Amino acid sequence: MRRIAVMGAAGRMGKALIEAARQAPGAGLTAAIGRPDSTLVGVDAGELAGQGRIGVSLSGELATVLDRFDVLIDFTHPTVTLKNLDICRRAGKAMVIGTTGFSADERRMLDEAAREIPIVFAANFSVGVNLCLKLLDTAARVLGDEVDIEIVEAHHRHKVDAPSGTALRMGEVVASALGRDLQKVAVYGREGQTGARTRETIGFATVRAGDIVGDHTVLFAAEGERVEITHKASSRMTFAKGAVRAALWLEGRDPALYDMQDVLGLR
């Protein structure tokens, strides 16, 4: 059995991860960690997730449960994830990271840690989204420079980073297929007298509203026709199941920085 720990276990995504780890053959939830100051520390993690008692209590510190798991799944905040990354690197524990909003310097810290431990890091763990990334690469290569490309994403009102990590990853895939540098061609939102659109631009638009789990659409717009590749998530379990799948896949892997394209065999 692959022993799995969930960071941020008292949150919405954490609860979904607990459920997914409980359901997956070959996986077992053996540790759950929340904030040190949480009043829920000590509560059974299964009860937190609506799964009934499972005999795993919520801990307030990762360091106190290092002997209870093989791989940590972390969907939290960059500051928290980087602290956990250092602990796992020192302890030789594998990680699955779904946290978004890392700076370029913070991304380099992931690269450095992956020299010592195996890590799956992805902006989105949905199988459908990762299939879309493959389709986007193909669409960009076929349609080339004859279309205008726009990326529109929508999430719930509580999401703190924009554009989403998934939207940015989609932009990276498209830009790479076209030989463009996303940092140079990306336009984030438009307002006022912007002037005519240039062909090489890749535009991003963001919506934050209600309880939207995650919608992403990439438009390839030409004269007379438009191709749209869309993914809509209706449940966090989509991401949770993908993360647990990645945790199982990591068993026996060499230290390296992997993503869901590796897990799904799409490379």
From Swiss-Prot:
Subcellular location: Cytoplasm
Residues that hold NADP(+) according to the record: R35
PROSITE patterns, per database record: DAPB
E.C. no: 1.17.1.8
Gene Ontology biological process terms in this record: diaminopimelate biosynthetic process; lysine biosynthetic process via diaminopimelate
UniProt keyword annotations, A-Z: Amino-acid biosynthesis, Cytoplasm, Diaminopimelate biosynthesis, Lysine biosynthesis, NAD, NADP, Oxidoreductase
A molecular function GO annotation: NAD binding
Pathway, per record: Amino-acid biosynthesis; L-lysine biosynthesis via DAP pathway; (S)-tetrahydrodipicolinate from L-aspartate: step 4/4
Any single GO CC term annotated in Swiss-Prot or TrEMBL for this entry: cytosol
Keyword ATP-binding: no
Recorded family membership: Belongs to the DapB family.
Name of this chain's protein: 4-hydroxy-tetrahydrodipicolinate reductase
Naturally occurring in which organism (per UniProt): Azotobacter vinelandii (strain DJ / ATCC BAA-1303)
Gene name of the record: dapB
